[in-house]
Amino acid sequence: MDIRAAEISAILKEQIKNFGKEAEVSEVGQVLSVGDGIARVYGLDNVQAGEMVEFPGGIRGMALNLESDNVGVVIFGADRDIKEGDVVKRTGAIVDVPVGPELLGRVVDALGNPIDGKGPIKAKERRRVDVKAPGIIPRKSVHEPMSTGLKAIDALIPVGRGQRELVIGDRQTGKTAIILDTFLNQKPIHDNGPDKDKLYCVYVAVGQKRSTVAQFVKVLEERGALEYSIVVAATASDPAPMQYLAPFAGCAMGEYFRDNGQHALIGYDDLSKQAVAYRQMSLLLRRPPGREAYPGDVFYLHSRLLERAAKLNDENGAGSLTALPVIETQGNDVSAFIPTNVISITDGQIFLETNLFYQGIRPAVNVGLSVSRVGSSAQIKAMKQVAGSIKGELAQYREMAAFAQFGSDLDAATQRLLNRGARLTELLKQPQFSPLKTEEQVAVIYAGVNGYLDKLAVNQVGKFEEGLLASLRTEHKDVLEGIRNEKALTDDLKAKLKAAIDAFAKSFA
């Protein structure tokens, strides 16, 4: 066998080139014990808090407890495949997720991996899940409306862009339905509104049944709302660390829009289950328990998440992230630990009540207990003009209704108040999946507060509203357009609206 000289020089060059290459050093540790989704790892001396580590078979985990002789790692996946003595590698990266418009229309898990079978996500950017909230200087006070399409909320408990409004109530009172209707209400703006008004939606399902999440996605898809929405799902069968992480992952995805001068809305459904998952992790990591066995930093868990919802000022792009966290109460007890925590963090709350729900008042909003701490600065002027008196009238009505149960002989003024209140309550009812545009709400509420419903039987109010809206949408488009463009009820518009309602009321009778 003969080797040519040229070949020898090529081989020597290759050898010389590869000589002295340093071996790659990666820091590894060893699993001491594993169980209940927690691994104790020996080694990994330089690991960072919150760093992603990798177990054999590609299972990932996150270092949470950094102790003197071992590291407590929570496992994002099944712990069955990890055994004592397994080698654990550092990745050097803090937990992050893909973000950007590529995620719109997709369903992902808490680590941003697609779970909808529509192929991989080619995101151009990744972000850390747990970042610091914007400070005081980059923010601006909330002043633009974030319309939900629900009369009871937009008129009485208005939510602004950049606000955090808690949705709180017992199970099966329609909490998720409020978030779903709000998402669906953004469709007209996405279809033919200006880009600067578009609101991208993120839904985070924590500890929900898979069937519930599938139903939610199906409704969004059928109604064409999935194209501007992202769904992050950590269902009941997912490990606790995934349920803990999902809200932070969803928030990072929403922040991408906020920081790029766009607007996003995120619904956390629900934070009670995130707190339970966090409690489970903390107790298994042997952190000391506090009230109701929650760890001492469970308040910080929710406050650092919800503080990231903000309205940024013009120098920072004027984007916003609005949060609608959900809390499930047990037996209407809003003074339990987690509900009081989240009430104190948010800028107002929407209380949903079981007995209202069963009385057929849906959405089952308790108007007396619900507040928006941003208030009317998150409403257009037209809505302020018509809805100003309605809250007071309803408060008087509730007081009188409780009182009137005892006495039969009521004077005319009280009778009038009770009649008006019953009709306004009826007017605020709304079927699911039928959000109304703001200008339509203004017209309907104008009819309610100006006595057009007083002569009708209570069971006719719904029909009157449907008929009035149909008439306005076909014969009086100019009135609705006027309210939409002017954002206020000028004398001219008021006269036109009054004439339109008068004409319809005559034909309805």
From Swiss-Prot:
Subcellular location: Cell inner membrane
Gene3D superfamilies per the UniProt record, alphabetical: 2.40.30.20, ATP synthase alpha/beta chain, C-terminal domain (1.20.150.20), P-loop containing nucleotide triphosphate hydrolases (3.40.50.300)
Similarity field: Belongs to the ATPase alpha/beta chains family.
Main location, first listed in the record: membrane
Recorded name of the encoding gene: atpA
Residues the entry annotates as binding ATP: 169-176
Molecular function GO labels: ADP binding; ATP binding; proton-transporting ATP synthase activity, rotational mechanism
Subunit structure: F-type ATPases have 2 components, CF(1) - the catalytic core - and CF(0) - the membrane proton channel. CF(1) has five subunits: alpha(3), beta(3), gamma(1), delta(1), epsilon(1). CF(0) has three main subunits: a(1), b(2) and c(9-12). The alpha and beta chains form an alternating ring which encloses part of the gamma chain. CF(1) is attached to CF(0) by a central stalk formed by the gamma and epsilon chains, while a peripheral stalk is formed by the delta and b chains.
UniProt EC number: 7.1.2.2
A UniProt-annotated Pfam family: ATP-synt_ab_C
Reactions catalysed according to its record: ATP + H2O + 4 H(+)(in) = ADP + phosphate + 5 H(+)(out)
Membrane topology: Peripheral membrane protein
Keywords: ATP synthesis, ATP-binding, Cell inner membrane, Cell membrane, CF(1), Hydrogen ion transport, Ion transport, Membrane, Nucleotide-binding, Translocase, Transport
Protein's UniProt name: ATP synthase subunit alpha
Enzyme class: translocase
HAMAP family: ATP_synth_alpha_bact
Site positions for Required for activity: 370
GO CC annotation terms, alphabetical: plasma membrane; proton-transporting ATP synthase complex
Function as written in the Swiss-Prot or TrEMBL entry: Produces ATP from ADP in the presence of a proton gradient across the membrane. The alpha chain is a regulatory subunit.
Entries under PANTHER family matching the protein: ATP SYNTHASE SUBUNIT ALPHA, MITOCHONDRIAL
